[in-house]
From Swiss-Prot:
Keyword Oxidoreductase: no
Pfam families referenced in this protein's UniProt entry, alphabetically: NusB
Protein name, as recorded: Transcription antitermination protein NusB
InterPro entries: NusB-like_sf, NusB_fam, NusB_RsmB_TIM44
GO cellular component terms listed in the entry, alphabetical order: cytosol
A GO molecular-function descriptor: RNA binding
Amino acid sequence: MASLRRRVRAIALQILFELDATDHSPDQVVARRLEEERLPPEGERFLRRLVFGAWEHASYLDRIIEETAPNWPVSQMPGVDKAILRIALFEALIDEEEKTPLKAIINEAVELAKQYGSDNSSRFVNGVLGTVVSRYRERRKG
């Protein structure tokens, strides 16, 4: 299951990156990627929840990112880093269905940053998420 969840997070990252860079419809992009990826039902549900949840709450999540990293405006942040942070923060602060442990959320985000981001992405993502978790811990038990 862990490898499926990592794969789904990587697909969600790619979808959010595309949505942020284009005017494509979230429904159409998700449908296209699901057709390409052929995920099992639990993977499909997880993907939909991550993408639509992070996209729907993007403004709120971006405010949290900017409060945490004021020297890095979200509008100037690399798209990969922004998408990874939105996914992880959605999972950590908003998603009530999964209850993924905070440590696992941060670890998965750092791994995505190592794989898809720049040389500094993993440190940046880890720093932002570590700070957010300590500030917002009361919003979610875990």
